Amino acid sequence: MLMLVMSNNFMQLFFGWEAVGLASYLLIGFWFPRPSAAFANLKAFLVNRVGDFGFLIGIAAVFYWCGSLDYAEVFANTHLIDGKSFEPWAGASWSIPTFIGIWLFIGAMGKSAQVPLHVWLPDSMEGPTPISALIHAATMVTAGIFMVARMSPIYELSETALAFVLFIGATTAFFTGLIGIVQNDIKRVVAYSTLSQLGYMTVALGVSAYSAAIFHLMTHAFFKALLFLGAGSVIIGMHHQQDMRRMGGLRKYMPITHITMWIGTLALVGTPFFSGYFSKDSIILAAQAAAGQGGWVQMYAYWAVLLGVFVTSVYSFRLLYLTFFGPERFREVHEAHAGHDVHEGHDTHAHEPHESPAVVTMPLVLLAIASLGIGFFTVGPMLFGDFFAGAIRVLPEHDTLAAVAQAIWHDEHGWVSAAVGFGLHFIASPVFWLAFAGFALTTYIYLFNPSLADRIRSAAAWPVRVLENKYGFDDLWIKGLAGGSVRLGQRL
């Protein structure tokens, strides 16, 4: 990751890019005797090779038309490709910046798990939970977001490439979040949440709010690592049970995990003054500014990220309520096991949930502190200051964050009062009220009328099947493309 981030040329970037992919492959398959882990790491490896093929084409195109792989030289020579086109065949004219931008972004689609190259990330949960927290939520999986932001001088030359990035990001943000609502594995709920939040970052890139994308990347690293490690703590306390339907009532057994996961969830849904509020709200406001002066793609993206707030709230509070509230459903499972094992002296007390040791809970507390305050203290320089001066280039006509700053950032009396004013903006923002609606609905269903969840599931059987089938993307990749390749090879 350090090589990837610190590189000053495309070649070194590519080596770092591939090295973190190798690390991901090896760590997903850490428990290699498990067939599911072996399949998951192979799936991640192959899907990312599809993205990396596009990334290589993009790098080759940069070298061909700019004559260098050094960032400084390439960005200084963008005038060589600005407004230029080429003919791949007679009568066809393709924009060079668009060609480069789309191929580079295909690499980001693989690394940062954007539709349709997202299918590997949920399966990466087969790896150890700290790995899920570190590289599949906080660092490696966001490398594609970093890369596109770093290449902003190229993307600013092509509105078509930006629109492509925006459409893919909006689709990922909304539709993968919906899948999280029907998941029962606690780690997979957080995994689909990660997919959705990566979509939000990509939307920020597509509306030229590169600083907002990196800002959300940073705040997301804290609260999503907290949620993953919190899920790991629950799994430890539940003796490696991951099905939320077999949990319930854990708040009295795991108080530290319970409180810290509440903090992570409140940051994720964008609760005012929590870290996620500042970064997510800035992305949605930037998308709104782009929708006001753009076309149907910009309008689609704005509504996708806006409605995604409600979806995020629903699956997040569903996870909390199924895990920490309600009846202690794990007792039914343990009693059933005790009945089967009565002749073997089975001890039901051995399965009693318990709080995780300090080596697990201390990182939760530290991440919870950051999830509370990091956004408030960094929103000024990262979004509206000169923190990225010289590293990110935005054309004046694309500067959606300027419109956001004009609307909500008033630092005449210092950054503290400006950050407080940004925090108080929630009163007039639909984002807060959508998140609150999701909270209220989920609270009513899972705390006061649990049978309603089953009735809704039965009434919406067809949409639920579509979501449980993940829109058929796994079938497309495994049975269609991979299976088709195998059949073709057999015939040849």
Locate predicted features.
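Hydrophobic transmembrane alpha-helices and their helix-loop junctions in integral membrane proteins
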Residues: 1-16, 22-350, 376
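Loop-to-transmembrane boundary segments
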Residues: 51, 257, 349-369, 473, ...
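Hydrophobic membrane-spanning alpha-helices of multi-pass integral membrane proteins
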Residues: 141, 169, 264, 363-374, ...
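Long, highly hydrophobic alpha-helical transmembrane signal-anchor segments
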Residues: 196-206, 277-296, 402-438
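Hydrophobic alpha-helical membrane-embedded segments
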Residues: 224-226, 310-322, 434-458
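Cytosolic juxtamembrane amphipathic/interface segments immediately preceding
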Residues: 241-248, 345-356, 412-420, 487-488
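Polynucleotide-recognition surfaces of large bacterial nucleic-acid defense/processing enzymes
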Residues: 297-310, 352-367, 371, 424-427, ...
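Aromatic-capped, Gly/Pro-kinked transmembrane alpha-helices
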Residues: 380-434, 444-492
